[in-house]
Amino acid sequence: MDHALLILVFLIGVAVLFDFLNGLHDAANSIATIVATRVLPPVFAVGWAAFFNFIAFLFFGLHVADTIGRGIVDPGIISDKVIFGALMGAIVWNVVTWLAGIPSSSSHALVGGLLGAGVAKAGTGAIVVAGVAKTVAAIFLSPAIGFMLALLLVLLVSWLFVKANPAFADRVFRGLQFLSASAYSLGHGGNDAQKTMGIIAILLYSRGMLGGEFHVPFWVVITCQAAIALGTLFGGWRIVHTMGSRITRLTPQQGFCAETGGAITLFAATSLGVPVSTTHTITGAIVGVGAAKRVSAVRWNVARSIVTAWFVTMPAAAAIGALFYAVGGLFLT
């Protein structure tokens, strides 16, 4: 096999591995609440989430892929070493946080890795400031919006069902959680898989393989959706436990509100091409439903440790990405 083609296949393989680990690491967010409320056992929940992760491309455009491909660093500086550094920065950080059971963001790990590798090659002038600012703003906005929507939904459904028989309300929201979990899984597949699509597409573009115009080939779309769905099937039970029960105890009603608030946030962000974190979004929503009950219902020490991981993720992945950019220079020539 031609050396250049071998390197291309290797880098696409690394990108698909990242997407798989994204499913393993982040897709637990899609099922944490439905598992915590005992509506579905984990083995069925992961299959449910994997299916909706896979079909997400049928519902959304590819705006997030475009942002990742052209809106974080200047496409003109993209090289094999930059892509390798970006992916390894995200993968290494994801593995470390997965082993520790910390729900950090795969999305911002990838952005951090791309920034670190891009700056290592071309300096800070390689940064697309507007795109990075949009992504950083999402760190704060996505959990805040998820929090507010979930809080308002809890207050609304509590008012609507205030006189309902508790057993009846429980049955209703157990059924509704199938819909809300499906919607959240669609949002996750729609936003997160597109980040890998953007990386592969910009790699192909940098090699002149897209006919001079940046776009995402259909085979890239299917490959990335399949990889994230398979990652979901292998699960991430440490993180499910943290997200679903250690932050606050959830009822089916609260689980429905958290998932619905999170799903609305993800749908809006994906439509606008904003690469947001599913971890940030569902955490904000879970905190919102817990706070609606009472502030003390939220285990703030657990939430605080998660927030700390958010702020560490991007710079840590950037440092790792810069390191692997240098490592890539040893064999990616």
Task: State each model region's role.
Residues 1-333:
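Multi-pass alpha-helical transmembrane bundle typical of ion/small-solute transporters
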